[in-house]
């Protein structure tokens, strides 16, 4: 029972971290790409 309660919390936390990290990396990548294109 302990593993069943801990696993979903870890999964939600993992999804939340990646859900915030992926758009941030793509956003920074798009900004750097636009700066290189302007130059």
UniProtKB/Swiss-Prot annotation:
Keywords: Chloroplast, Electron transport, Heme, Iron, Membrane, Metal-binding, Photosynthesis, Photosystem II, Plastid, Thylakoid, Transmembrane, Transmembrane helix, Transport. The keyword GTP-binding does not apply. GO terms for cellular component: chloroplast thylakoid membrane; photosystem II reaction center. One of its GO terms (molecular function) is iron ion binding. The chain crosses the membrane at residues 14-30. It is found in: Plastid, Chloroplast thylakoid membrane. It is a single-pass membrane protein. With its partner (PsbE) binds heme. PSII binds additional chlorophylls, carotenoids and specific lipids. Heme binds at residue 18. GO terms for biological process: photosynthetic electron transport chain. The keyword tRNA-binding does not apply. Its main location: plastid. Its cofactor is heme b. Belongs to the PsbE/PsbF family. Heterodimer of an alpha subunit and a beta subunit. PSII is composed of 1 copy each of membrane proteins PsbA, PsbB, PsbC, PsbD, PsbE, PsbF, PsbH, PsbI, PsbJ, PsbK, PsbL, PsbM, PsbT, PsbX, PsbY, PsbZ, Psb30/Ycf12, at least 3 peripheral proteins of the oxygen-evolving complex and a large number of cofactors. It forms dimeric complexes. This b-type cytochrome is tightly associated with the reaction center of photosystem II (PSII). PSII is a light-driven water:plastoquinone oxidoreductase that uses light energy to abstract electrons from H(2)O, generating O(2) and a proton gradient subsequently used for ATP formation. It consists of a core antenna complex that captures photons, and an electron transfer chain that converts photonic excitation into a charge separation. This is Cytochrome b559 subunit beta. The lineage of its organism: Eukaryota, Viridiplantae, Streptophyta, Embryophyta, Tracheophyta.
């Amino acid at each position: 029972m302990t593993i069943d309660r801990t696993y979903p919390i870890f999964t939600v936390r993992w999804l939340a971290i990646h859900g915030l990290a992926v758009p941030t990396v793509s956003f920074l990548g798009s900004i750097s790409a636009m700066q290189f294109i302007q130059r």
